[in-house]
């Protein structure tokens, strides 16, 4: 190995970068639909607009079914 210079990896230039943002899981308060429930009665009982329930649950109509789980709001 005469005349050869061994290569040394330079670790000093490697900087660990932290992410600029962190993702947190979103949790929701939910409601289990019972027989006789409507979006209107659910919205009224939680004091939120029907349209907010529809948007949050990606509903295209106001039809809901017993046993369905409806997101109410983020926790």
From Swiss-Prot:
PANTHER family tied to this protein: LYSM DOMAIN-CONTAINING GPI-ANCHORED PROTEIN 2, MEMBRANE-BOUND LYTIC MUREIN TRANSGLYCOSYLASE D
Residue intervals of the LysM domain: 29-72
Positions of disulphide bridges: none
Protein known as: Uncharacterized protein YkzQ
Pfam families the record matches: LysM
